[in-house]
Amino acid sequence: MSGRNGGRRQSAVSGRDGGAGSTLTWAALREVKCAELEEAADGWGRTSNRADAARDRIESRLLPGLRGTQKGEAAEAATRRLRGLGTNFQYIYTECGLLRTTLNSLAHEIKTQQRVLQRALDEAAALRFTVHADGSVTYPAGGEGLVDGKPLPGGTASGVPNPGMAAPSGLVAPNPNAGRAQDIADRVAQAVRAAADADWRYARILRSLKAQEGLGVSTATWTDAASDAEAVRQAARGYLKDAVPHDASPAERKAWWAGLTDEQREEYLTVYPDQIGNLDGIPALVRDAANRDNLQLLIGKLEGRNDGDAETRLAALREIDRQLRARTKPGEPPMYLLGIGDQGNGRAIVSYGNPDAARNVAAYVPGLNTSLDMEFARGDLKRARDTAMAAREIDGETAAIAWLGYDAPQLLDGMSSLDVAGTERAETGGRAFHGFMSGLAASNDHDEPHMTAIGHSYGSRTVGAATQYEGGIPEVDDIVLVGSPGVGVDRAEDLHVGKDHVFVGAAKNDVVTHLPSLGSGMLEVAGKPFGPMGELAVDAVRGGDDDLWFGRNPASEEFGARRFVVDPGPPFSLDAHAQYFDPELDTESADSIAMIVAGEGHKVKQESAE
């Protein structure tokens, strides 16, 4: 979005042509008007904000109005064009925001070096030294000669690129003024050198922020935008990122965000949507806005790769994007993107309902074989959506979340993958889930929200790990465990919500929760129909004396939880392990989970524990 100057390199500060060997003088550095750079940044910021407002108008007013009043091919064509226009505005918002931050960051670095320079010049003036145009410093006679006692002659000191490599000035020039002059000359040289380096670094970035011709914003355009964003992130580290409170508590992060100016927030959202969108404690609406923008950058980034993992994640990201853009049907809660990323097996956190405004908030942790793929984008998100819709029929102020914030174990290679038999991923995921729930508690508008942690399959082990921090999971009142292979503790009260607030669903034909109770002869037969998962269950049972893979069976009487009624599920199939949330396949289980989430767990129909 910036121009080129006949292919020649141009200084971002002076606007003059140059190259790698161009020199910036200290006089030119002193005269740089950083206020003009900041004014230009403000102009790009206003353009970015206008584009964002236009995009919001299209998505929140024009598209819903069109869908609600118009039908037919013409309406569909108009909808497509409006969506395209909204994408254009989103691209303008992103690129203009990057320009704003680039110019502000450049001004920040130049002003820093101007202060270094000015302090050196002021010191030279106070000592009556002369700073020449080339940065050398002339100093007067001083000190006393050892032989005649007369003042030692003055001289001139020139700044060196790396003062630490130069011999101490006292060894070559005993005049006490020589050392002071050398120090001043070095600081002048360092300031000029650092400013020149910043000048050319930002000039390269500004040249790259150039829109392609035409009105369409293609995937390739977003790929280019992702590259632009990465370049600006690297350049602006000292200006912005170092201040992001990654090591602070969620409550402190919330306070940090509240204390920023509007301009600062806009810059963080534009340059670091990946950081802000995944920072626990930041308000949900802010995270959603940041992650929707980062989603487009991730799609562009992965589009440029040609490998199977990238294609799998790309398909999932596009499906999530499609759902975010789709019209919310009557009775459905709005969708919020609270986290997105391509690290590990992929990350995605999706809420149905605003978790900050909701009185009841539930977060569901999926388990074995879950990754950022189409199964997650369709199946796991549907579980959260179904739970939210059913719970909102009981209490409309409810939100339900699908949380893929960790690397769940994968059974890609059959028995060669033993991750599921260990606890490392659960412990790592439990730490992340604990932080996420802390963030929800910090950003929720209610004094005492009702919060529920739901773990399915290996996800229940992850939830169990999250409860083992001091005080348990922050603000969580109820815990739901379904299809659980164990949670790492042997008693419900060890989950720190009270045993009457721990609910367990275990289908009769769920291989994960029942294979361990079978005899070894039956294990051999029963494991085969289930492929790698069945083999692993058999191996886990034979390999130890635990009631289940990860401790005592949560569905057992000894564990002490409240076991609710679930459908037994089809035999000799993994479907029994997957239908706990499905209102069509297991109405009783889905309804029970919804009641617990809505704060009415006391109404859940129980069945006897094993």
Q: Language-model features: where?
A:
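N-terminal secretion-targeting helices of virulence/extracellular proteins
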Residues: 1-218, 428, 442, 524-525, ...
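Glycine- and acidic-rich phosphate- and metal-coordinating loops
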Residues: 41, 79-80, 364, 402-404
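Residue-level detector of short, conserved catalytic/binding motifs and their immediate flanks
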Residues: 101, 347, 360-361, 477, ...
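Long, composition-driven intrinsically disordered regions
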Residues: 193-399, 411-414, 441
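Stable alpha-helical elements in mature extracytoplasmic
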Residues: 40, 78, 99, 198, ...
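Gly/Ala-rich beta-loop-alpha elbow adjacent to hydrolase catalytic centers
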Residues: 454-463
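Lipolytic serine-hydrolase domain surface
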Residues: 341, 353-357, 367-449, 469-610
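Short, glycine/acidic-rich beta->alpha junctions
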Residues: 84, 88, 95, 344, ...
